[in-house]
Regions:
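SH3-family beta-barrel domains
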Residues: 22-50, 61-65, 72-75, 82-87, ...
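Beta-strand-rich domains and repeat architectures in extracellular enzymes and scaffolds
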Residues: 57-58
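Positively charged n-region of N-terminal signal peptides that target proteins for export
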Residues: 1-5
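Intrinsically disordered, low-complexity polar regions and short flexible loop motifs
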Residues: 53
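Bacterial N-terminal signal peptides
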Residues: 7-17
Length: 167
């Protein structure tokens, strides 16, 4: 009896120690905001550096205001970001905005009056268009661009997580 209790305790201890915990949302060390998270480029241009300081070389320059970016790390006033092509580097936080935007991935993507493909198509957007993100349901997001507002199928957008819901 003692051996079976000892064996049970040993097994439970091993399970507790070696099974990874359920993934909790990681938080940024500087902002305590979720990592990863989406932001947008606040300015017309933004230097993308190899490391988190002005001493690091500029690898390239983002040249599109409101472009959605994904923050994957934080260090001081710097945010490590990636774009839709998974290219990235370190950008100073002052160049970023919490305003949510998305990039249209599918060419001539229909924008519907409601989150229903049988409703009126209000516009067709070309791949690469940047739109403001409004609301999201499980499969749809409401977006706006150049005076048009409507619903797009979420899988055709970059800048929003597949399971993200927004009111």
């Amino acid at each position: 009896m003692r051996n079976s209790i000892f064996g049970l305790i040993l097994t439970l201890t091993a399970l507790i120690l070696f099974i990874p915990p359920l993934q909790a949302s990681e938080r940024g060390s500087q902002t305590n905001l979720p990592i990863p998270r989406f932001v947008s480029l606040r300015t017309d241009t933004g230097n993308v550096r190899r490391g988190p300081s002005l001493n690091h070389r500029i690898d390239w320059v983002f040249k599109r205001r409101n472009m959605p970016l994904k923050v994957i790390d934080e260090y001081g006033h710097w945010r490590r970001v990636t774009d839709r092509d998974n290219e990235g580097g370190w950008v100073h936080h002052s160049l970023l905005s919490g305003t949510r935007t998305v990039i249209i991935q599918d060419d001539l993507m229909p924008i519907y009056a409601r989150a229903d493909p049988s409703t009126l198509v209000k516009a067709h957007l070309q791949a690469g268009v940047v739109a403001r993100l409004r609301k999201c349901t499980r499969d749809w997001c409401q977006i706006s661009v150049d005076g048009y507002r409507g619903w797009a199928i979420k899988t055709g957008l970059w800048g929003v997580e597949a399971d993200e819901l927004r009111d």
